[in-house]
Amino acid sequence: MWTLLYDAINGSNAVIANIDNASGTDADKVRIKGQALATRGYMYMMLASHYSFSIEKEPNAVCAPIWLEPSNSITALQGVPASSVSEVYARALQDLKDALEYIPENFSHGTVSTDQYKIDYLTLLGLLARTSLYAAQWEDAYNYAEAALKINPYIMNETEYHAGFNDCSNKEWMWGLTSTLDDNMPAYTFYFKDTTTDGAYYTSLCADPNFVYDNFEEGDYRKDMYILGYTQQGQEHKMLCTKFRFKDVDNQLADILLMRTSEMYLIKMEAAAHLSGKESEAQILLQEFRQHRLKDGYTASAVTAAGDDLLKEIWMERRKELWGEGFSLTDIIRNQQSVVRKQCLIQKLDAEGNPVQDSNGNIVMENIGHTTVKLPDGTDFVENSIYYLLRIPEQEELQNPNLYSKYPKSTLYR
């Protein structure tokens, strides 16, 4: 991940440094510079949210180097010092805010399928909302999410929600990568997600049955996505999820979701819960959002939780809504929470549905939940575990002589 992020940063730096002298219209060059700034800001947000603990825990902890100019083989070996997590977030936010000056408000990737990867004005607002939330800039997170929702407030209905999360034409999607027969590289990141469609071959992305059983209220149509069954090729009896399904099974194609409006609603309510005088608004927003995910005939209960209890309810709503979309680890880190894993034992049944017994006539139980319930060192899962973070690669430590010249190497890695 480190190399992927810095490759994108270096490419963005090259565009920013050279676009003014490139051929093309001034309008195109200005917009492209804005998109390069937004891309760089997005990459720095990814570094800050994965290589350091929460900014609220250790704002001055070492995180990652900040490069603002294109590098080459010489400058790369000279290296630059790693900045703190607060500095990396500040850089990310500055790049994204600068991009607002370059990407016109009326620029949209529209409905052309092959343009969905482009960062348009709406996508930029979404990136600002997400990054502000991660950086604990609650007012900015609220305002940017609200601005994005003014442009696109659409929320999927039940039919759309069960359509497979595989098509950029979905009106709730704000950003995505299309996959076609001519350009199918994005689909490679979808393969592991579809564990239920005939013709799919991966079996790894299964849900925690305890999460499903304990947290979805009656009438929540999202719960219908989770089914107890056998993974492809009948390998394991697990809690499967039908959320992600190939759009074209024969060619194993599916569009890749990067951002949607539901995330903006969740950002807005979480930010509101942190802001003075907006707690009641956060409660109403949460109730309204839950109502959208209920089947006809059901009514969401009023939200009465306050303070930390309200935040925990919002975080759980994020888990339920954004499951499998790449947010859970980041949320655990930034909210200083613990991974929760436990077994889920059920009565084992044979092919005819009869209880299986051992040689002594005892009912046989099987675990359909997690098989790994401890950290790699054998200890219990805890908040702020080093195992939740990605580590600065050893290659960077060996090749960058200035890496820890500004902020010391974390004692966790010594």
For each feature predicted by the language model, list its residue ranges.
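TPR-repeat structural position
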Residues: 89, 138, 278-279
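Hydrophobic-face positions in mid-chain alpha helices that act as interaction patches
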Residues: 118, 142-261, 296-301, 307, ...
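Aromatic-residue-lined binding/catalytic grooves and analogous aromatic/hydrophobic interfacial grooves
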Residues: 97, 121-155
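Conserved, well-structured interaction surfaces
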Residues: 1-51, 83, 100-105, 251-256, ...
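Inward-facing hydrophobic residues that define packing positions of alpha-helical scaffold repeats
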Residues: 9-12, 89, 96, 145, ...
